[in-house]
Structure formats: C-alpha cells, structure tokens
C-alpha cells in the first residue's frame, strides 16, 4: 500500500539530485520549452509621428556632436522589451535626426542596418558605406550590411530624419555583437552609383567583380512607387493580406534585402480591406502616406503619415485603408525564419477572413481601450 508514496518520494529525490547536478527532467518541463504554437512575449504597439517628432527636435538642441553624441537617435522601445531596447524581439527601429551641416563619424558593427528617409528635402545629404556615397531623397532606402563602415553627412541647410532598423536584438541574443569606431578615410572612396553600375544589367568589359559580399545599395523611392503604381494600374489584385506589395531584393541573388531583414513597400487602395493572417515573423511598419487602421489580435491601431507600429510574430493582423491611397514601408525578420526552416503562415478562417474588433489602441493614454469603454 505504500508503493505510491515510495514512488513519489523516490521521484522527488531524483529531481533534487538532478537539480544539484544542473540537470532537468524533460518529462516535467517539456511544455516550458516545446510550445504547441509560438509564444510571442511582446505586444503590438504604435508610435505617433506627432508625439515623437517634438522629442526628437528637443534632442536636436541638447544632444550634439560637440557634446560627444556620435548618433542622435531615439529607439522605438516596445513596453515589453525595455531591457533589450527593441521594437520586436529581433528588430530595433529608431528615428535619427541629422541637423543641417552635421556629420556623424564612421564606425561599423556586427548588426545589419537599413536607413529609410522619413523626412528629407534632398540635396547633399548622404550615408557613405564602404567608401560609397548614397544620397538620401525622401523615402529612399539605404543599406548598411553587417560589418560595413558607414558615416553620415548633411551638407544642406535642412534637417533630415530617417528611420533606422537594425537586427541588433538578434545579434545580441546570439552573443555576437561587435562595434568598431573608424575614420572618414578608413575606406577608399568609390564613385557615386558604384554599386548600381557594377550590379546592373550592363557593365563595361574589364571591370572587376563586385567586391562586397552584400550589396551596398540605395533604392530610390521614385522607382519603388512607380512599380507599385504600375501594378495597381495594370489591374493586379495583389496579395489578399497586404494589397499591392513589393520586396526590395538583393541584386546579387534576388533574395531578401539583407540576410536577416526583408524590406517591403505596399500600396493599399482606397477603402481596401485585406484578409487577416499571421506568421512566425515579426514586422515593423512606417506609414509613408495615407490614413488607415491595422487590426492586430482584435485591437484597432489607427495610423497616419510618419507613424510606426509593430506587429508581433504569430499575431492575427489585417489592414483597413481610408479614402485615399496609402503607402506603407515595412521591415520583417522573415528571412531568419525561412533560413532556419521555421517560417509558418496561416490565413484567418473562422468565421470569415476578418477579425472581430474588440478594442482600440489609445496613443494618448498608451493603452488599449475595450469597445465597451469607448
């Protein structure tokens, strides 16, 4: 009759001895590390341009190169990821301000980065990557692949603000972060459009192969917008989940923008309502123009020009556009998930392709209000 008690006593003793040996019983904790579906660990969030810009401009007066600030940027920190200073678990975005006449010194790091010109009046404002100058017209995308030397300069009379996106949360998780300061003459200068000329369809005979493992590229917004508009004009239906959407591809292999980050631009046509879906990738959005709503797990996030919002991995989401065309830029960690063989995507099917809206994000109070309290 004492057998069950003896079993439990012996099992408890085994567990205690295992703990002292720094071992863990899989039969007891398997559900903690082998989940039936992704455990997200952070919430959707939205940062309004009109709230962030005044803070950035105040920083422009206080944080200066003369006071030792190498970069003047403000991170979009998810409330659930404060210790990592990140926007999603793998992506960190920020707004960076470079005032008229300022420069930011050269450095390089293990994290890959992109720059998206959120507000620019053009002219001689640029990032120099591996010695090549990449100009920044408004809404242009510039790449800073992992380990590349880069510096910034604004030789105009106007401030510029761009969106930074880096994979440093992932790099830090892998304990692979490296940072190295440099000088403006660290890399031999290259002519403007060096990469586009070397990677184009036509190249002078006798030119050497492209020297970089990942392209140092500038993707002009005028070209991307023309591609989106042409697709819409042709009558293309686009994606049921994202409308007309285009990826910024790697010209060396037609793959993702960078090994860890894929950048995209999408056009939502007037009154367009996309179907809900979810994926094991997380995505950060920047609103180029237009107004609309993205519903994430039943909560409505209303957005306008300059706003930034994050959709966590495995979160149901869909877009509801307003009365005019809306253009969105986004960064996703989908390449990481595909490389690891763990990318999954699922369409929302019950009871239909759209979620029931149960709440709305209140950016003023920084909270979600349930419909019953609205």
Swiss-Prot record:
It holds the Pfam family Cupin_2. Changing residue 109 to A: Loss of activity. GO terms for biological process: catabolic process. Its EC number is 1.13.11.86. It catalyses: 5-amino-2-hydroxybenzoate + O2 = (2Z,4E)-4-amino-6-oxohepta-2,4-dienedioate + H(+). Inhibited by SDS and o-phenanthroline, a ferrous iron chelator. Partially inhibited by EDTA. The lineage of its organism: Bacteria, Pseudomonadati, Pseudomonadota, Betaproteobacteria, Burkholderiales. Keywords: Aromatic hydrocarbons catabolism, Dioxygenase, Iron, Oxidoreductase. Disruption phenotype: Disruption mutant loses the ability to grow on 3-aminobenzoate or 5ASA. This is 5-aminosalicylate 1,2-dioxygenase. The keyword Transmembrane helix does not apply. Optimum pH is 8.0. Induction: Induced by 3-aminobenzoate.
